[in-house]
Amino acid sequence: MRVFIIHNKYRYYGGEDSVVDEETKLLKSNNHEVIQLIRNNSEELKSFNSKLNTFKNISYSNESIEILNEKVSKFGLPDIVHIHNTFPLWTYSVLDFFKKKNIPIIMTLHNYRLIWEKLGFLNKNRKNYGFFKDSNILSYLISKLTNKRKDLLSYVTKFITHTEFTRQEFSTVILSSNKLIIKPNFLHSTSNTIKPIEDKKNVIFASRISKEKGILTLIKTFKNIDLSLDILGDGPLLSKIKKKDFKNIKFHGNLSRNQVSNFINKSKFLVFPSEWYESFPMTILEAFREGTLVLASNIGSIKSIIKDKYNGILFNSGDCFDLKKKIEWILANPKECNKIVTNAFHEFNKKYSSETNYRQLIKIYEDAIKNYKN
């Protein structure tokens, strides 16, 4: 099977970029012809003119159409196209292009940009973080412009969501709910064995260092805790936070996936304190795989992944007091924590391995191709 993978990389390498790379490797390892068509914000948006041009064409990009025509001339048409992130360079114009070529389209809904107004800006009961430049006003404007041609979403054959929570949220916008399929993210299994939590020392945070990821709540909490915290990653708040003097916090910057996995493996527990809806955090999966306890905020799809005190620990999002309380519980109950880790480890091997995910992904592709032709 020939598969085109379409993705717009982010400025900071994150979970979506990782999923694209892992799915590509997975398909290639099963002898499929995979061609990645990647555009990159950091490379293509350097000048003022390029940024202005992108803003003008954010609803529909003729430049993207030209690029796709060149790629099809070079490689030929695919059997199926799998689209990940289209913002801001590709745009929904890619849907128009492949529909006219009669190619079935799979689209993974990694984030909530499509329904951002519903989830945050127009909902006073929810804490909201702008996805663009941390600005609500700019995010509202970009959301309006980006979704100006959301009529093109009707060309998508199947949408992949990661949990029942995300499927329900997107069903309010994508009225053809039969197009929404649940397929979680995955990681390749390792030969690691589970180490008792008592034998581990530090705590780890591995994510984008920005407000919506809960980094400020985490740091405020750790001021009053006698534990060492390793912070992995980059982001807009890194330089500001590093200026402060934290005796028990170390910053390690961006690391390779293997380095991140090694850190997680050696850590007592991973804290995932996000304060904005996540889709399916890869670092939580890594902790499951590495036999490391997860302490996460009880928000959005995280509650679909983690069952409190069964395969992880949940705390109230943005609540320093509750976070500290749950950390104290972990330290006081190592036996219970080891049982939780074992449950998560077994769940990973059953539900989130590459073998299981490949069977799910290829069935989605095959069904889409078969039904499209019929």
Residue ranges of each PLM-predicted region?
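Nucleotide-activated donor-binding/catalytic signature segment of Leloir-type glycosyltransferases, i.e.
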Residues: S239-S261
